[in-house]
């Protein structure tokens, strides 16, 4: 009989499997109580259903409040919006997927290898586990939620909210966000992990972790060569590591680290652990509650603090120095050594034999636990103490401290306080003991002791003990022939006196225990008065709290009190009278003894072989011997037992919970009541009459007799058919007689039907079981929840009904006409057989090796055939499932609607018929032969599976992929899949073929509701036909043949379709999105309608009249569209869609709905240097949209739109702009022709840039042309008949070139204008020998340029320099040098922003005399970095960069007059000159220009008026200035595209008005500021400002 079962999850098959150990021996079960494991039931509950094709679960709830507790998702299965409550579980196996799952408290989700879970929410108490190879995406972990990811598992896009738990290691792959930001684990490296509330990260050998945060309840494990740096260990966070790892971070004590075998400042708490390896060390460690430090041999720890519930272990060869043990802290020294340990109150130091602890400081309340084999030294409150060489001195034992003095060893001056303990073994010696209250001494009279206790002096010497105090765990053992006097036994103390020993003058206080027998001699007092034992007579003994008295035969005891924990044992022939048996007191005796006394039931006695009213509890025992009797016995708890021996009898016995009555052969029991937890055993030859079995009670009868039984509900009977039984149960009368059992009720009980015997009409309820042995039989058995039936080899059962929770195990036996209802299970073991079984919904049958099932009907239930098992003539109806596992087989199976057969790895099936709605599913290494698929049936063959000699009738579906092996016939002939190639497959009515990477499919037909799925790298060959609503799917499909859509009513493809093949559509409607490229092109005929939606297409299209092609929602088609000999099809371009022409094209009706037709070269032709115009011929045009066109106005060629018929609508011509110059700007270029209609065309931006000039669109009749002049004629010439020629406009590029040609003049002059003020600083500091100065300048100038150009110049810059002043008697001369830089932004009036960076430097000299005359001269050189930026009319950006050099200077003369004491006036004359070099300019739009030498010459006359003020000791000089300047340069030349000359005339007069102030802050430092306004013929500067400083030497 298989008695021990284990269930093991098999990762490869994705299911639970059952393993067993054979325990049956000799063909018959041993006759003893059994609690058989319900292995089949467990297997059935844990065994998930095998995957069916594409099972989709939506809005399911599992667990509490739901109808189902579990869900298994296998290959192809999906589950969406699942809620998993308490007790619910979801397992996602390989190929299965779960989306939008919510896991609540007590719910579980398991994602196995190959399974996936997306968008999971884990609430408090919920659990998600991702196994190796499994994946989870977008998991949200709320507070208390738990995510576990095994090594090799993947979880990405995690949201870990506060309190959410992650448990993983560095072999896993994770990413997501937590309250600290983004975190990840990849390639063995973990970053920014948050561990809290049970979170766990294991950093494996050679891996690493950075920026880990460990909050309370979090756990970080780092061992070996692993490393973890930048750790934040908050309070309650745990680290487990060893000193071979590398760690660094901060804890509440500051920075900590482990490096090079050295650990510093570690905090160990809440399961944290540090292993200090050999040769390594740890310093400044703090061990809090739950923390552990282990110091191996050769390792060391220094400055360790051990707090409450912290532990330090020092092993052999290890050492610990300067350890502090606080209250609740523990240090264990086992063969190692500890030095300088301080034990504070409540601290605990344990030193094992062979361990060493020296320089101990034992403070008051500190505990030391050791023995005299250890070595110790230190100080306590009594001074120095030590243990060495087996001798202990001055030890203090308290608060859990303990000293064991071994035989031959000694202890002197020992103090034992409350909670301390001293044990002295026989032959050991302890003298000068001080035993204070609560201190415990344990010894026997072979030891030698002396000392004082609260009673005075005590001693043990030469086998004599005197004045001993026993309490709080203390004990004294008086050996035979030894004696003890004046012993006091308090609560918790114990005195044991052997036979022949003597103890007198005993004081036994409440709770004190005496253990002895009537051969000893005792005297003393207890709470009942005087007691004694002498000459085999005991009087007034008190037995409690472990006390024991044995009264031997012929001896006696009187007035014995037995309290809880006390035992009185009276041997046969012994006498004990006047017993008081209180609750919990134990009597152990037999009916040969003589007893009398009282218990809680009243008076009891045993006399003359008759026992009456005995109470057996707390392990008490009564033997009823032959010829004797027991009446009115009560048997209570703790296996209290009555044995009724042969010839004995028991009457009116009550057996309560934990009580036992055994009736041996020849014994008898009458009128027994068995209550819950009570047990009565009737052995062979024994008898029981009138037994009542109440709920929870148990009667066991093997070969014995029990009659007149009353079996109440919940009462258990265990028997075999060799027994004789009769009685009544809830079903009526029952009996066992002559090997026949009838109407038995088994609940928690068992019935063993032996060979040749039988059982009929048996009911088996929860906990009940029936075993049918070899040649035994059972008929009409009903098995309910928790009931079990076992049928051994050659045993047989017939007409069995198995309800929910019931289980039948055929151990080589047979079962006929069994019905398995919901939740019922049958296991058919080797050599077993089941015939005519009906498996209803929820029922389950499993066939093991060498077992078989025949003529089975499965109505919604399941049958599983394991290795070596077989099933024949099986019919599966709706909801029925048959699983053929490795080595299992099935023959002649019929699958009706809703029935499913699953062939797993190594399973084989022959002669299956699949009717409509039925399904056969073949998994890897599964094999089927001679399967017939009728209309509506489905055959699914997974990768690695095989199916041969298949007959696929019309309407039959095949679901498979190119890694399977198939062969058979269909309507087209022979089909096959082998070696990754599929040929002549027919897919309809749910059929699916998946073409895997590197595989191909030839001549496939996809009919109604069929699907052809092509993975990236899969190839289609031959003719692939999609008819009716057949579907093609795939992210990337390669077509090397002809992809033929034949009258497909609604074909939709989303993905990438490429290859050298062709796409043909005959009739029907198709929609394509993604990417499409077919070298053989696309052909539309017979009214075909193709819509491209968000598609990138690259193919030439041939259309037939009556067909239509639509581009929608941003689609892009690159290729020619042409008609055939019947004409051309219609074309529509909608929304943001674009049609790129790669050549001349012809369409029927062209409709633009905000779409674009692009004549410009595509990416594939853009590298072609020579421009080739393209023409588009359309029969008609309507709608609105854009035509992007190319022109080469320079060669007078361009693209052409030719509408032969009617054109209506509004269209924009987006014609590419250029900077190149046409040959002739006056010749029109035709771009559009229409046959008729009112279509309106306009240019994008209203014009086209071509070189220097802008071109405009002009209409002539139904043709449209590009011309260089505007569409409006010029104005009339007064007095003539000739109008003024139309106006031409320069392009923005030309304007920008003209702007940039003049910019250096204004930049230079502005810098020079600011520079002139520096001479005033020199003149103000007449006594200074020189100095340094600096100033910042800023301006905003609006400038008019040549040919209508203009711009704004914004300048900001700085200048700095220094000079030396020479004294020339009546005058002075300042000579200096300077450098400058300015950043100049140019905003062109017609668009664009250019920049000029100006870097310069120069020399200056200023002469001035005492009469106020001055002359100032400057020479300056500049380098200009010019960056031109503008746009053409079509919005195309234009740029050109170049550098330019320039130089110039100024000369100024004037005189300062004093009008009065504080007022002065300064008239002056100034001239400036500048010249910038000629420069060739090239723009990236093809425009070229030559800026000639740019010149400037200015004259200026002006006056400054100011005052000198003394403000708080500081000289402040406010002033006003006005001047008139004239520019003389009017002929700066610019030539564009070597075709057109332009003149930049910058001449004109400018007025200047300003105000400023300077201040001499100290004798050596001054500052100034000025603002001015300038306005002239070509310029206006609303504001120009400067600020500066000077520091004198």
Curated annotation (Swiss-Prot):
Domain called Autotransporter: residue spans: 1325-1593
What the entry says about domains is:
The signal peptide, cleaved at the inner membrane, guides the autotransporter protein to the periplasmic space. Insertion of the C-terminal translocator domain (beta domain) in the outer membrane forms a hydrophilic pore for translocation of the passenger domain to the bacterial cell surface.
Post-translationally, this protein is described as follows, namely: Glycosylated by heptosyltransferas BAHTCr. Glycosylation is required for adhesion to mammalian cells and colonization of the mouse host gastrointestinal tract.
Physiological role? Autotransporter required for the colonization of the mouse host gastrointestinal tract, possibly by mediating bacteria adhesion to host cells.
List every stretch annotated Disordered. 65-100, 1267-1286
Can the keyword Transcription be found in this entry's annotation? Answer: no
Q: Where is the composition biased (Low complexity)?
A: 86-97
Q: How does it sit in the membrane?
A: Multi-pass membrane protein
Protein keywords: Cell outer membrane, Glycoprotein, Membrane, Plasmid, Signal, Transmembrane, Transmembrane beta strand, Virulence
Q: Ligase: present as a keyword of the record?
A: no
What organism, scientifically named, is this protein from? Answer: Citrobacter rodentium (strain ICC168)
Q: Which InterPro entries match?
A: AIDA, Autotransporte_beta, Autotransporte_beta_dom_sf, Autotransporter_adhesion, Autotransporter_pectin_lyase_C, ESPR, OM_autotransptr_brl_dom, Pectin_lyase_fold/virulence
Pfam families with a match to the protein in the record: AIDA, Autotransporter, ESPR, Pertactin
- How is this protein named in the record? Autotransporter CRAC
> Any one cellular component term from GO for this entry?
cell outer membrane
Where does the record say this protein resides?
Cell outer membrane
Biased segments, Polar residues type: 65-85, 1269-1280
Q: What happens when the gene is disrupted?
A: Severely reduces bacterial colonization of the gastrointestinal tract of orally infected C57BL/6 mice.
Signal peptide span: 1-54
Question: Would you say which domain of life the source belongs to?
Answer: Bacteria
């Amino acid at each position: 009989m298989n008695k021990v079962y284990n269930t093991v999850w098999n990762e490869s098959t994705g299911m639970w499997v059952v393993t067993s150990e054979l325990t049956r021996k000799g063909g018959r079960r041993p006759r003893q109580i059994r609690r058989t494991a319900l292995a089949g039931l467990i297997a059935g509950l844990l065994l998930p259903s095998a995957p069916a094709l594409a099972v989709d679960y939506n809005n399911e709830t599992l667990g509490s409040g739901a109808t189902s507790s579990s869900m298994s998702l296998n290959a192809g299965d999906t589950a969406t919006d699942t809620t998993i409550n308490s007790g619910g579980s979801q397992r996602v196996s390989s190929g299965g997927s779960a989306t939008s799952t919510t896991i609540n408290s007590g719910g579980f989700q398991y994602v196995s290898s190959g399974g996936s879970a997306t968008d999971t929410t884990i609430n408090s108490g919920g659990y998600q586990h991702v196994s190796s190879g499994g994946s989870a995406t977008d998991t949200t972990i709320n507070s208390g939620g738990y995510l576990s990811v095994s090594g090799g598992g993947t979880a990405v896009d995690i949201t870990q909210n506060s309190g959410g738990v992650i448990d993983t290691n560095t072999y896993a792959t994770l990413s997501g966000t937590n309250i600290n930001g983004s975190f990840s684990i990849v390639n063995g490296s973990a970053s920014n992990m948050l561990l809290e509330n049970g979170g766990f990260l294991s950093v494996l050998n050679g891996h690493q972790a950075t920026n880990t945060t460990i909050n309370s309840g979090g756990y970080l494990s780092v061992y070996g060569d692993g490393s973890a740096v930048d750790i934040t260990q908050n309070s309650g966070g745990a680290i487990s590591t060893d000193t071979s790892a590398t760690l660094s971070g901060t804890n509440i004590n500051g920075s900590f680290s482990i490096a090079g075998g050295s650990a510093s400042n570690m905090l160990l708490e809440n399961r944290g652990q540090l292993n200090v390896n050999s040769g390594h060390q740890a310093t400044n460690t703090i061990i809090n509650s739950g923390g552990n430090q282990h110091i191996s041999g050769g390792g060391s720890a220094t400055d360790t603090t051990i707090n409450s519930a912290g532990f330090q272990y020092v092993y052999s060869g290890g050492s610990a120095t300067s350890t502090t043990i606080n209250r609740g802290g523990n240090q264990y020294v086992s063969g190692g050594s500890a030095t300088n340990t301080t034990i504070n109150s409540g601290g605990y130091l344990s030193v094992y034999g062979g361990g060493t602890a020296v320089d101990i400081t034992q403070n008051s309340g500190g505990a030391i636990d050791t023995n005299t084999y250890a070595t110790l030294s230190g100080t306590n409150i009594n001074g120095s103490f030590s243990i060495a060489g087996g001798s202990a001195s001055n030890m203090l034992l308290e608060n859990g401290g303990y000293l064991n003095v071994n035989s031959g060893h000694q202890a002197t001056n020992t103090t034992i306080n409350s909670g301390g303990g001293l044990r002295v073994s026989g032959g050991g010696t302890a003298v000068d003991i001080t035993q204070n209250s609560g201190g415990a001494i344990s010894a026997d009279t072979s030891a030698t002791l002396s000392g004082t206790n609260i009673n005075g002096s005590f001693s043990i010497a030469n086998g004599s003990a005197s004045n001993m105090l026993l309490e709080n765990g203390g004990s004294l053992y008086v050996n035979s022939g030894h004696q003890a006097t004046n012993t006091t036994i308090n609560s918790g103390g114990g005195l044991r006196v052997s036979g022949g020993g003597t103890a007198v003058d005993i004081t036994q206080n409440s709770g004190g225990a005496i253990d002895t027998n009537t051969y000893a001699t005792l005297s003393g007092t207890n709470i009942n008065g005087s007691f004694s034992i002498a000459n085999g007579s005991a009087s007034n003994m008190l037995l409690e709290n472990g006390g024991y008295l044995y009264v031997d035969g012929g001896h006696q005891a009187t007035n014995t009190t037995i309290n809880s924990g006390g035992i009185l044992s009276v041997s046969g022939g012994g006498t004990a009278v006047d017993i008081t048996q209180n609750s919990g007191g134990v009597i152990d005796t037999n009916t040969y003894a003589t007893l009398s006394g009282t218990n809680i039931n009243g008076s009891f006695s045993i006399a003359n072989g008759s026992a009456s009213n005995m109470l057996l509890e707390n392990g008490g025992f009564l033997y009823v011997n032959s010829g004797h009797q027991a009446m009115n016995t009560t048997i209570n708890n703790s296996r209290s037992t009555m044995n009724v021996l042969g010839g004995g009898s028991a009457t009116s016995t009550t057996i309560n919970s934990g009580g036992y009555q055994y009736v041996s052969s020849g014994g008898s029991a009458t009128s027994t009541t068995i209550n819950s937890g009570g047990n009565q055993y009737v052995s062979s030859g024994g008898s029981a009459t009138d037994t009542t079995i109440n709920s929870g009670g148990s009667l066991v009868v093997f070969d014995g007799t029990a009659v007149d039984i009353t079996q109440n509900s919940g009462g258990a009977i265990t028997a075999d058919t060799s027994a004789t039984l009769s009685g009544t149960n809830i079903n009526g009368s029952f009996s066992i007689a002559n090997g026949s059992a009838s109407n038995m009720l088994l609940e928690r009980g068992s019935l063993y039907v032996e060979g040749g015997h039988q059982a009929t009409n048996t009911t088996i309820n929860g906990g009940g079981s029936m075993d049918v042995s070899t040649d035994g039989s059972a008929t009409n058995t009903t098995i309910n929840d928790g009931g079990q039936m076992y049928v051994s080899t050659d045993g047989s059962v017939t007409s069995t009904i198995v309800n929910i929770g019931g289980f039948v195990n055929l151990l080589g036996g047979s079962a006929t006409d069994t019905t398995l209802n919901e939740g019922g299970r049958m296991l058919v073991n080797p050599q077993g057989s089941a015939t005519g079984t009906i498996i209803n919904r929820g029922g389950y049958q499993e066939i093991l090796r060498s077992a078989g099932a025949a003529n089975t009907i499965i109505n919604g239930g399941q049958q599983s055939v394991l290795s070596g098992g077989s099933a024949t003539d099986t019919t599966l109806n709706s909801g029925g499932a048959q699983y053929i596992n490795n080595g299992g087989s099935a023959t002649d199976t019929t699958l009706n609607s809703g029935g499913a057969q699953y062939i797993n790895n190594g399973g084989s099936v022959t002669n299956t018929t699949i009717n409509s709605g039925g399904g056969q599913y073949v998994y890897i290494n599964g094999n089927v032969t001679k399967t017939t698929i009728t209309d509506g049936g489905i055959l699914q063959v997974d990768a690695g599976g095989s199916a041969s000699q298949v007959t696929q009738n019309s309407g039959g579906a095949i679901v498979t992929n190119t890694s399977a092996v198939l062969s058979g016939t269909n309507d087209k002939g022979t089909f096959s899949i082998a070696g990754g190639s599929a040929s002549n497959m027919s897919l309809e009515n749910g059929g699916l073929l998946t073409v895997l990477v590197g595989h191909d499919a030839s001549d496939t037909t996809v009919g109604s509701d069929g699907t052809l799925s092509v993975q990236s790298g899969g190839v289609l060959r031959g003719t692939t036909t999609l008819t009716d609503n057949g579907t093609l799917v795939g992210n990337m499909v390669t077509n090397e043949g002809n992809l033929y859509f034949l009258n497909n009513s609604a074909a939709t493809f989303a993905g990438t379709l490429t290859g050298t093949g062709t796409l043909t559509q005959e009739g029907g409607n198709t929609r394509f999105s993604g990417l499409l490229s077919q070298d053989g092109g696309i052909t539309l005929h017979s009214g075909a309608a193709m819509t491209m939606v968000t598609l990138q297409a690259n193919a030439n299209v041939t259309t037939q009249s009556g067909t239509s092609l639509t581009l929608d929602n941003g689609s892009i088609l690159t290729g020619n569209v042409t008609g055939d000999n019947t004409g051309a099809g219609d074309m529509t371009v909608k929304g943001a869609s674009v049609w790129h022409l790669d050549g001349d094209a012809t369409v029927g009706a062209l409709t633009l709905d905000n779409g674009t037709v692009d004549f410009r070269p595509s990416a594939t032709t853009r590298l072609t240097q020579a421009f080739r115009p393209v023409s588009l011929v359309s029969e008609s045009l309507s709608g609105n949209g854009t035509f992007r066109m190319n022109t080469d106005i320079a060669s007078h060629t361009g693209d052409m739109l030719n509408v032969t018929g009617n054109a209506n609508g509004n269209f924009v011509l987006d014609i590419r702009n250029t900077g190149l110059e046409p040959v002739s700007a006056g010749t029109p270029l035709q771009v559009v022709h229409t046959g008729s209609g009112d279509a309106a065309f306009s240019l994008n931006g209203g014009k086209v840039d071509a070189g220097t000039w802008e071109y405009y669109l002009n209409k002539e009749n139904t043709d449209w042309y590009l011309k260089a002049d505007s569409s409006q004629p010029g104005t009339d010439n007064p007095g003539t008949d000739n109008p003024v020629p139309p106006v031409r406009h320069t392009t923005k590029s030309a304007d920008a070139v003209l702007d940039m040609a003049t910019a250096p003049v204004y930049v230079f002059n502005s810098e020079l204008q600011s520079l002139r003020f520096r001479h005033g600083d020199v003149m103000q500091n007449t006594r200074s020998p020189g100095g340094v100065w600096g100033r910042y300048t800023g301006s905003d100038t609006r400038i008019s340029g040549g040919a209508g150009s203009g711009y704004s110049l914004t300048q900001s810059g700085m200048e700095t320099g220094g000079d030396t002043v020479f004294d020339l008697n009546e005058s002075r001369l300042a000579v200096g040098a300077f450098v400058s830089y300015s950043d100049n932004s140019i905003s062109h009036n017609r668009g664009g922003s250019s920049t000029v960076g100006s870097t310069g430097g120069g020399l200056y000299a200023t002469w001035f005399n005492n009469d106020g005359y001055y002359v100032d001269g400057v020479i300056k050189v500049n380098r200009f970095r010019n960056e031109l930026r503008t746009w053409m009319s079509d919005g195309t950006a234009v740029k050109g960069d170049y550098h330019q050099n320039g130089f110039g200077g100024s000369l100024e003369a004037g005189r300062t007059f004093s009008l009065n004491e504080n007022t002065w006036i300064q008239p002056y004359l100034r001239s400036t000159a500048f010249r910038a070099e000629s420069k060739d300019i090239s723009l990236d739009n093809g425009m070229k220009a030559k800026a000639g030498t740019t010149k400037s010459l200015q004259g200026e006359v002006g006056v400054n008026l100011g005052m000198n003020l003394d403000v708080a000791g500081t000289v402040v000089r406010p002033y006003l200035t006005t001047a008139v300047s004239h520019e003389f340069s009017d002929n700066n030349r610019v030539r564009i595209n070597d075709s057109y000359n332009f003149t930049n005339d910058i001449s004109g007069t400018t007025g200047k008005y300003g105000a400023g102030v300077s201040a001499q802050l100290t004798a050596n430092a001054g500052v100034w500021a000025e603002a001015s306004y300038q306005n002239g013929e070509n310029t206006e500067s609303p504001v120009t400002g400067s600020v500066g400083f000077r520091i004198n030497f």
